[in-house]
Amino acid sequence: MKAFQRDFIEFAIERGVLKFGEFTLKSGRVSPYFFNAGLFNRGGDLAKLGRFYANALMDAGVEFNVLFGPAYKGIPIATTTAVALADNHNLDVPYCFNRKEAKTHGEGGNLVGSPLEGKVMLVDDVITAGTAIRESMTLIEQQQASLSGVLIALDRQERGKGELSAIQEVERDFNTQVISIVSLADVVSYLGEKGGFDNEIAAINTYRENYGI
């Protein structure tokens, strides 16, 4: 695990974005942890979040021309990542996001920002069912662009309805790479290093035995 990954987990726990306990997911599964990126809701948090996304992107070394943030949660993530790439990595990258409903007046259409063209890096918080990715792929293909990769905060490393995780399904279906700042395995490693989280680690390991990939 790299320093920026350790720092990200610490940051997420400090801000209450990553919590431990019992949480019923949409799938009906009772998860021993919950990740809610919507709680990165202050200016300073958002600036810091962008730096983590930018670090993960640079670390992965995937070539791309434009950042795309699917509405709604992907919009501030794409924005802050673009700022962090410019400020910290000397990369002035265009970004784009979509509207949920197409605008019929003014500039019209359902895309805002830079043209969606070339190699697209899609940024979002997590992939649960892959629905947002599939909807975004329709937009990307309509613009004759290609999906270079997907960047998310946390890989839950959890099976969907079949044997694969939602991330593995996205990678298979769209022949692309999904990059995450951290994975659930990284979270477990971090908790082990910090100490005092034996119950949380045991609960996560049991959950992974049932639903992990």
Swiss-Prot record:
5-phospho-alpha-D-ribose 1-diphosphate binds at residues 26, 72-73, 99-100, 103, 105, 124-132. Its EC number is 2.4.2.10. One of its GO terms (biological process) is 'de novo' pyrimidine nucleobase biosynthetic process. Belongs to the purine/pyrimidine phosphoribosyltransferase family. PyrE subfamily. One of its GO terms (cellular component) is cytoplasm. The gene is pyrE. PANTHER family: OROTATE PHOSPHORIBOSYLTRANSFERASE 1-RELATED (PTHR46683:SF1). Pathway: Pyrimidine metabolism; UMP biosynthesis via de novo pathway; UMP from orotate: step 1/2. Keywords: Glycosyltransferase, Magnesium, Pyrimidine biosynthesis, Transferase. Homodimer. This is Orotate phosphoribosyltransferase. It catalyses: orotidine 5'-phosphate + diphosphate = orotate + 5-phospho-alpha-D-ribose 1-diphosphate. Catalyzes the transfer of a ribosyl phosphate group from 5-phosphoribose 1-diphosphate to orotate, leading to the formation of orotidine monophosphate (OMP). It comes from Alteromonas mediterranea (strain DSM 17117 / CIP 110805 / LMG 28347 / Deep ecotype). Orotate binds at F34, F35, T128, R156. It is an enzyme of class 2 (transferase). It comes from the Bacteria. Its cofactor is Mg(2+). GO terms for molecular function: magnesium ion binding; orotate phosphoribosyltransferase activity.
